[in-house]
From Swiss-Prot:
Record EC number: 4.2.1.-
InterPro entries to which the protein is assigned, alphabetical: ChsH2_C (IPR002878), FAS1-like_DH_region (IPR039569), HotDog_dom_sf (IPR029069), NA-bd_OB-fold (IPR012340)
Organism, as annotated: Mycobacterium tuberculosis (strain ATCC 25618 / H37Rv)
Reaction(s) catalysed by this chain's protein: 3-oxochola-4,17-dien-22-oyl-CoA + H2O = 17-hydroxy-3-oxochol-4-en-22-oyl-CoA; (2E)-octenoyl-CoA + H2O = 3-hydroxyoctanoyl-CoA; (2E)-decenoyl-CoA + H2O = 3-hydroxydecanoyl-CoA
Family indicated by similarity: Belongs to the thioester dehydratase family.
Gene3D superfamilies in alphabetical order: Hotdog Thioesterase
Protein known as: 3-oxo-4,17-pregnadiene-20-carboxyl-CoA hydratase alpha subunit
Record note on domains: The DUF35 C-terminal region is not required for hydratase activity. This region is involved in interaction with LtpA and is required for optimal LtpA aldolase activity.
Biological role: Involved in cholesterol side chain degradation. Catalyzes the hydration of 3-oxo-4,17-pregnadiene-20-carboxyl-CoA (3-OPDC-CoA) to form 17-hydroxy-3-oxo-4-pregnene-20-carboxyl-CoA (17-HOPC-CoA), in the modified beta-oxidation pathway for cholesterol side chain degradation. Can also use octenoyl-CoA and decenoyl-CoA, with lower efficiency.
GO biological process: cholesterol catabolic process
Pathway: Steroid metabolism; cholesterol degradation
Region annotated DUF35, chain positions: 198-295
Length: 311
């Protein structure tokens, strides 16, 4: 599963499952763990270790540092992530699609109250927005948002919004189809008027030019109605459409391509028509009206869009 549409559909299925069931921490909030944590961090606030100091500060006794919230629900070295935890399937989805790199980008925690020794914390997680693909300094990637809630009983005591980036490391070998030779193929010609489109293809987006009157146009035309320093206005297509017309090319040979191959004129959901190769379909089974979707082929130095059956 490598197509953008495939990934989006799989993400939607994971998201539709909703939050995971609350999972209880292995141990209650406890003083030994608090002692170890504050010593390791160097936090000398006495309310975490001295009962009298905590009561003087208005607490019923010693309290746990709020920043320890993740500590209480760690699974340990031998822990197994629950099947309904969305992080497991979402990581596997992107690993299988070649996005093997991972880095945390944002973490925002909210603490609703202090925890007390003896309280048993539970955790649940829910998948948020998944945005991509985006070109980053690390490589092409997807930003994955997750919302996590900690509870004591039915009371929310803390929550966290965090985001990770799953990416294909920049410079990693591209998976080039066997029937294509990028060194021999004719590369797309990009100009000031079409650069936005090919930049979109590189980012795995089909960008359609929007004219001054709001209508959509493809192929792009020079935007003579605006100053040349103003970026081209466009919308991002869903990438879905139907075959409006097609041809099966048998001869002559085309540099970098293996014959026969199918060239299809696709009418996109947005109403414009776009030409490209239809891949992954038996030429004998291609028909007008056939549902297709955009897919992208990343060569070492450039990218190309194509169509594939939308089954």
């Amino acid at each position: 599963m490598t197509g953008v549409s495939d990934i989006q559909e799989a993400v939607a299925q994971i998201k539709a499952a909703g939050p995971s069931k609350p999972r209880l921490a292995r141990d209650p909030v406890n003083q030994p763990m608090i002692n170890n944590w504050v010593e390791a961090i160097g936090d000398r606030n006495p309310i975490y270790v001295d009962d009298a100091a905590a009561r003087a500060a208005g607490h019923p006794g010693i309290v746990a540092p709020p920043a320890m919230i993740q500590v209480w629900t760690m699974m340990g070295l031998g822990g197994v992530r629950p099947k309904d935890d969305p992080l497991g399937p979402i990581i596997k989805l992107f690993d299988d699609a070649g996005y093997i790199g991972v880095v945390a980008t944002n973490c925002e925690q909210t603490y609703h109250r202090y925890l007390l020794p003896g309280e048993q914390v539970s955790i649940s997680a829910e998948l948020g927005d998944v945005v991509g693909p985006k070109q980053t300094a690390l490589g092409e990637g997807w930003f994955i948002n997750q919302h996590i809630v900690w509870q004591v009983g039915d009371e929310d005591v803390a929550e966290m919004n965090w985001r990770i980036l799953k990416f294909k490391p920049a410079g990693s070998p591209s998976s080039v189809p066997d029937d294509l030779d990028p060194d021999a193929m004719m590369r797309p010609s990009s100009s000031r008027d079409t650069a936005f489109f090919w930049d979109g293809v590189k980012a795995h987006e089909l960008r359609i030019q929007r004219l001054a009157d709001g209508s959509l146009r493809h192929p792009p035309v020079p935007a003579v109605w605006q100053d040349k320093s103003v970026p081209i206005n466009y919308v991002v297509s869903s990438g879905r459409g139907t075959v409006f017309s097609f041809v099966v090319h048998h001869a002559p040979k085309v540099p970098g391509r293996t014959v026969p191959f199918v060239i299809a004129l696709v009418e996109l959901e947005e109403g414009v028509r776009m030409l490209g190769e239809l891949r992954g379909a038996d030429p004998a089974r291609v028909a007008i009206g056939m549902p297709v979707r955009a897919t992208y082929i990343d060569f070492p130095d450039w990218s190309l869009y194509a169509w594939e059956p939308d089954e």
